[in-house]
Amino acid sequence: MESGNIVNAQPKLSGIIDGSKSYMYEQLWKLCAGPLCDIPKLGENVYYFPQGNIELVQASTREELNELQPICDLPSKLQCRVIAIHLKVENNSDEIYAEITLMPDTTQVVIPTQSENRFRPLVNSFTKVLTASDTSAYGGFSVPKKHAIECLPPLDMSQPLPAQEILAIDLHDNQWRFRHNYRGTPQRHSLTTGWNEFITSKKLVKGDVIVFVRGETGELRVGIRRARHQQGNIPSSIVSIDCMRHGVIASAKHAFDNQCIFIVVYKPRSSQFIVSYDKFLDAVNNKFNVGSRFTMRFEGDDFSERRYFGTIIGVSDFSPHWKCSEWRSLEVQWDEFASFSRPNKVSPWEIEHLVPALNVPRSSLLKNKRLREVNEFGSSSSHLLPPILTQGQEIGQLSVASPMNISLRYRDTTEAAMNPSRLLMSYPVQPMPKLNYNNQMVTQIEENITTKAGTNFRLFGVTLDTPPMIKDPIKQIGSDISKLTERKKFGQSQTLRSPIEIQSKQFSSSRTCTKVQMQGVTIGRAVDLSVLNGYDQLILELEKLFDIKGQLQTRNQWKIAFTDSDGYEMLVGDDPWPEFCKMVKKILIYSKEEVKNLKSSKSLSS
């Protein structure tokens, strides 16, 4: 090929993704790219969006469009055919990227594609987020036992101190030698000698990810993935000075007018601007309207795939110069706060339409009522509300009502999102329940409580009640506790303590609860494993929390998984119950289809 981006329309085609790279290289590259990286297939019909390419190259997308669009009359999208794909890695930073060769509107060029039946060896792999200990100068790399057995060459466990030297190859074909040990108290797998040289050379820090891949022949590959805050838009060595000077639009315009191929650089974590033809049509046919609910996949700070829910609040052009373009045409509002920045305008193919569940019981909706205190960007909005409205309850955690607890009127966020006009309407709802000293939800006892008439006022059309005055609240709490103790006898004797001690105990016990998240349900729950005696009781409790009686026991529709302290996801049931309670950090309920997808991407261990 020539040095420029534009070459002859009939190049010599190899018919494979990258003939100079091995299958192991390809697998390692994809793992380093992450679960959300979507590379088109060779010979596939795609739509190319110049706006997205400019986003990758230039930080100021709109300014670049304003300067170049009057000169180059280029459509907002080009229908192309994928001619070649080269998976590459930047020499200095180890940033991975793909060079994708496209041909506009080419139907006459025959592309020899890969055989679908070609031999694909089995590979084992694992990824781990580096800890402070992993990156310290005097430590080593701690390998989880399961991954050490599956992905590293086997040790001779008959030796008093099993150890051996292993050889791993990175994406630059550089060889790295590590000493694999199994020792310590308790014994654990670790990489010591050679590890410090590796992290120093790669400039790895806490939060980065290490990737190991091992093939059937024993070949071991190693790669890295840098944390989000360390990644720039695009390495300067990738984009030539000539390309930056003439701009992406000029290159695409020349290829479009002359029917010749052009090369674009695609980088993982960037918005998808090369979209398969079928995926684009499916997205457009979904007809996303204002008020439609959707879910979108993101990569979290721990490099795991997460889904966030939102509502479409507008449909408009992202740039005034590119009329009727689907690129970032949907203005969205997110349901919940995230620790990383999310776009307020997305493209239709980036999201999935969320069909509302019409058969959800009313009792389930009542459980989901809460007061939202944090806006999309995480800034507190409590300065807009009176003090009585800033005592919200965080989902998935238990909160304790103080002696001066008040009843609040709060909104159903699910109903409000589906019908924005109701945001300015007031309607009565059930008061928030309080917690008794045994962490059981009870109805507020109103006997023997003398109140003063409160004053009603309105804020944004919502009627608010001033808190009633309670006479002698400490005495009242003691009376309430006595009545509850007589009503329900516990398995072990309990000594009544002062209200301050009881409230302290409530906060302490709330930390023993485990967060539960169900696919398709925005609001999470919490379950106390210490009061359960096994998996059967856990299943019954989860069914009760999400109002899906009998659906978890059959396991035909839903599967239960969990994450451990290392962040790995596994299906429940394989570990003894006491051991499961010690290592579980979060419980997840996935659909059967989602479990299959996670297993295929090796994000979930069976």
From Swiss-Prot:
PROSITE patterns: B3 (PS50863), PB1 (PS51745)
Entry's Gene Ontology cellular component terms: nucleus
GO biological process, one term: auxin-activated signaling pathway
Location, primary (coarse class): nucleus
Positions of the PB1 domain: 511-592
Gene Ontology molecular function: DNA binding; DNA-binding transcription factor activity
InterPro entries: ARF_dom, ARF_plant, AUX/IAA_dom, B3_DNA-bd, DNA-bd_pseudobarrel_sf, PB1-like
Swiss-Prot/TrEMBL keywords: Auxin signaling pathway, DNA-binding, Nucleus, Transcription, Transcription regulation
Residues in the DNA-binding region annotation: 126-228
Disulfide topology: none
Family recorded in the similarity comment: Belongs to the ARF family.
Subunit structure: Homodimers and heterodimers.
Function: Auxin response factors (ARFs) are transcriptional factors that bind specifically to the DNA sequence 5'-TGTCTC-3' found in the auxin-responsive promoter elements (AuxREs). Could act as transcriptional activator or repressor. Formation of heterodimers with Aux/IAA proteins may alter their ability to modulate early auxin response genes expression.
Note on domains (UniProt): Interactions between auxin response factors (ARFs) and Aux/IAA proteins occur through their C-terminal dimerization domains III and IV.
Name of this chain's protein: Putative auxin response factor 21
Gene name, Swiss-Prot/TrEMBL: ARF21
